[in-house]
């Protein structure tokens, strides 16, 4: 298998603290670049854990279609602005941030007061505009999760009618693009591939960490396949042949041989197949003539038994 290398050829931080990283991975065998690119993209876009604002409480507001006196934005605008905030919580517990601002003021993300467990990535992002002589009191809830979690109206906490739920986007990666280039022809004339992958995050994690975490998830997914233990189905007993089911009476044995076998609990050909020639001779009153008779009767239906126990 080819030993490939990973090079980060570009890293940018935008004004909103979003980060872009571009990586080159290669050389790879034909087809491997597509496999890597698709797998990494799926995990990067939907499998990484992140943080998001999941609910907002605004003093004096109990539904999302309200307006706030002295505030330029309506409640829906404020909820949308909060939804777009990039935050990074280092705990799995619910975290709450609060602010109280008196106008005139531009209310920004950095005005939110959190515990030391939560970092606001883009502190300059606008939340609302408060006019002179008015104030805004606001509370946001931050949780960790994976993927996208829409508001479940059926399970909303009706006891907190002023807590406005938000569709939560936990995905720390905003965009992933990849392209595949052919590299120099290797020995033997086989063409190699190189994967170029661009990862854009919201700033709560770096592209390097996002790539590493997605790779670790894929390793954990595939690792059990390397040590698969096959569980064999219990073997089915072979069905007995039609000949073995023939009753003893149909062998047309002499009365003496028939009676001796019956006394020995031999009732069918299948019972006889457990005997050797020596075993037949040990049956009481069963001589060599009767044994030969049984051997001949069995041979007529295509069955033979061993001469001795050791050759069975």
Curated annotation (Swiss-Prot):
Cysteine disulfide partners in this protein: none
One Pfam family from the record: RNA_pol_L
Protein known as: DNA-directed RNA polymerase subunit alpha
Transmembrane annotation, as ranges: none
Domain remark text: The N-terminal domain is essential for RNAP assembly and basal transcription, whereas the C-terminal domain is involved in interaction with transcriptional regulators and with upstream promoter elements.
Keyword Repeat: no
SUPFAM superfamilies per record: C-terminal domain of RNA polymerase alpha subunit, Insert subdomain of RNA polymerase alpha subunit, RBP11-like subunits of RNA polymerase
UniProt enzyme class: transferase
Catalytic activity annotation: RNA(n) + a ribonucleoside 5'-triphosphate = RNA(n+1) + diphosphate
E.C. no: 2.7.7.6
Molecular function GO labels: DNA binding; DNA-directed RNA polymerase activity; protein dimerization activity
Ranges for region Alpha N-terminal domain (alpha-NTD): 1-229
One GO BP annotation of this record: DNA-templated transcription
Residue ranges of the region described as Alpha C-terminal domain (alpha-CTD): 245-312
Top-rank taxon: Bacteria
Family recorded in the similarity comment: Belongs to the RNA polymerase alpha chain family.
Complexes and interactors: In cyanobacteria the RNAP catalytic core is composed of 2 alpha, 1 beta, 1 beta', 1 gamma and 1 omega subunit. When a sigma factor is associated with the core the holoenzyme is formed, which can initiate transcription.
Gene: rpoA
Keyword terms: DNA-directed RNA polymerase, Nucleotidyltransferase, Transcription, Transferase
NCBIfam families: PRK05182.2-2, PRK05182.2-5, rpoA
Function noted in UniProt: DNA-dependent RNA polymerase catalyzes the transcription of DNA into RNA using the four ribonucleoside triphosphates as substrates.
Cellular component terms (Gene Ontology): cytoplasm; DNA-directed RNA polymerase complex
InterPro entries named among the record's database cross-references: DNA-dir_RNA_pol_insert (IPR011262), DNA-dir_RNA_pol_RpoA/D/Rpb3 (IPR011263), DNA-dir_RpoA (IPR011773), RBP11-like (IPR036603), RNAP_asu_C (IPR011260), RNApol_insert_sf (IPR036643)
